[in-house]
């Protein structure tokens, strides 16, 4: 089970789909990495030669993935909160950030509904 960017890739999947287990690499980026590394698309992770593995690892190192990407995203959110932007306030209050309506839904962000005592007559 090869380790690339600190992630164990699944042995039985093709290399492009195995790379998507790395945070920050989607299927399109994975196909680009495989093509740039010169590895055939139909090779399974278990069948990679050490040379091919090194080429793929070198291509993945060009991208910001896993811990570095998670850190950047959290720092971006923290920066939005510190400058007092609207998006930062929404993050701080745990509400939807991208303009969704919240009158009826948004339960994922707002959490479980709390009933108000004495509301019904």
From Swiss-Prot:
InterPro entries: Rbsml_uS13_C (IPR027437), Ribosomal_uS13 (IPR001892), Ribosomal_uS13-like_H2TH (IPR010979), Ribosomal_uS13_bac-type (IPR019980), Ribosomal_uS13_CS (IPR018269). One of its GO terms (cellular component) is small ribosomal subunit. Residues 89-121 are annotated as: Disordered. The keyword Ribosomal protein applies. Keywords: Ribonucleoprotein, Ribosomal protein, RNA-binding, rRNA-binding, tRNA-binding. GO terms for molecular function: rRNA binding; structural constituent of ribosome; tRNA binding. GO terms for biological process: translation. It comes from the Bacteria. Located at the top of the head of the 30S subunit, it contacts several helices of the 16S rRNA. In the 70S ribosome it contacts the 23S rRNA (bridge B1a) and protein L5 of the 50S subunit (bridge B1b), connecting the 2 subunits; these bridges are implicated in subunit movement. Contacts the tRNAs in the A and P-sites. Part of the 30S ribosomal subunit. Forms a loose heterodimer with protein S19. Forms two bridges to the 50S subunit in the 70S ribosome. Belongs to the universal ribosomal protein uS13 family. This is Small ribosomal subunit protein uS13. The lineage of its organism: Bacteria, Bacillati, Bacillota, Bacilli, Lactobacillales. The gene is rpsM.
